[in-house]
Curated annotation (Swiss-Prot):
EC number: 5.6.1.7
Protein name: Chaperonin GroEL 2
Alphabetical list of CDD domains matching this protein: GroEL
Species name: Anaeromyxobacter dehalogenans (strain 2CP-C)
Subunit comment: Forms a cylinder of 14 subunits composed of two heptameric rings stacked back-to-back. Interacts with the co-chaperonin GroES.
NCBIfam families in the record: GroEL (TIGR02348), PRK00013.1 (NF000592), PRK12849.1 (NF009487), PRK12850.1 (NF009488), PRK12851.1 (NF009489)
Amino acid sequence: MAAKEIVFDQKARDAILKGVNTLADAVKVTLGPKGRNVVIEKSFGSPTITKDGVTVAKEIELENKFENMGAQMVKEVASKTSDVAGDGTTTATVLAQAIYREGSKLVAAGHNPMDVKRGIDKAVEAIVGELKKLSKPTKDHKEIAQVGIISANGDTTIGNIIAEAMEKVGKEGVITVEEAKGLETTLDVVEGMQFDRGYLSPYFVTDAERMEAVLEDAYILINEKKISNMKDLLPLLEQIARSGKPLIIVAEEVEGEALATLVVNKLRGTLHVCAVKAPGFGDRRKAMLEDIAILTGGRMIAEELGLKLEQVTLKDLGRAKRVTVDKDNTTIVDGAGKKEDIEARVKTIRAQIEETTSDYDREKLQERLAKLVGGVAVINVGAATETEMKEKKARVEDALHATRAAVEEGIVPGGGVAYLRCVKALEGVKVNEGEKVGLDIVRRAIEEPLRQISGNGGYEGSIVVNKVKEAKEAAFGFNAATGEYEDLVKAGVIDPTKVSRSALQNAASVASLMLTTMAMVAEKPKEESAAPAGGGMGGMGGMGGMM
């Protein structure tokens, strides 16, 4: 085991502070509408230019191991806030730096770190409670767009496209971000349920020009197992032929004789039919087939449910107004499922989302939920160069997260003003003498985001903070984009409550951990031994006889 280097007490806290300051100073220049850019070197390709705090934070590694630990802990604040709320990473970094900087001075002056920590925790709890009181739900398309615009660093196109996507697919809908082929940023919305499986044979196509099969007012057979034997299907196909309606078969596989017979009947015009492979694998496939069955009002044909293919009648089949199948995707629009059945299914999936610990499972469950209730929207991000594309795509993803957070927990006035309006909540907090120090640290730290936003815009932070503090209206603040003092909510400068809350909670959590640090342990750097001098290649003589 390699030897370790250990530092204690003040020396440890000073090293942490140096690391925290290095990282925070690089990140905080990006805060606010007039924030500056940071250029990050890449080992290959062009450098990345960004105004996103967490992207800058992730790139920073310091040479000194103890300072690096401080930087990494603040990096954790930024990425945790980004994971939970999608935005507010720079604000969280600024708050963590302010709390730790003030706190380390007071601990050095002899205050008990544990008292200071308790004071910080009580102050944060009071401010979070006040933020929730200040919060208002998002009312309309315009407010959602404003949240998106602010999170996308003032890009109105992105804000409006996100608001439109949210409107089309609803709160539960899935919105994905893709790279577009051209320069334009566009929105595609898929109505109904779509899954990524196409037709099993191109002979099922009804529209040869677009190479897709469109089945209007169709029956849907949902079968869990393979279908290869024709005689199992025959009784059902006779009933379908008599009804004159089209049929779509969704099964694990349709092959051999069964597929050939379906194709022949389709080409003859006896049956209007299309076969599709079931989506997903294993248990997830079963769950998705159940979803399709509930959405279309049919039953999943599975032997474990006591249902055999030869016994199926028309009433076991699902119905849909329209099914469109191309070579890669199947879309079911307007399924005939009962509203209460779909709602019960949605409730079950929501419960599973709450319980699951796997991010991958959660994502898949959310996709299933979206397909049942809303639909899927795809934002295609267009840009002129690859560098711009990377930066723009990251901004769209941030803005999307922030708008979701706003819909979830509501909005508060932006521009760092909401924190100032919560100071009054600290008056009634019961603390002892030692904890009061922690309370005062938070009181000063929550002014820091507004100071930084003003400073980045070229204004004097302290003057701005005092002017905003004097105002009585909650929404009155400083709009750094225009340089005006005004009602920020009306001006569209708003933050999701979840973002403001997470930023403060995460910053205080990590800063108070760092304040109570008494020792740091790191590996000693290995001393590089000098390379031995290179000698000649002895013993190579006498090779003349090899001719």
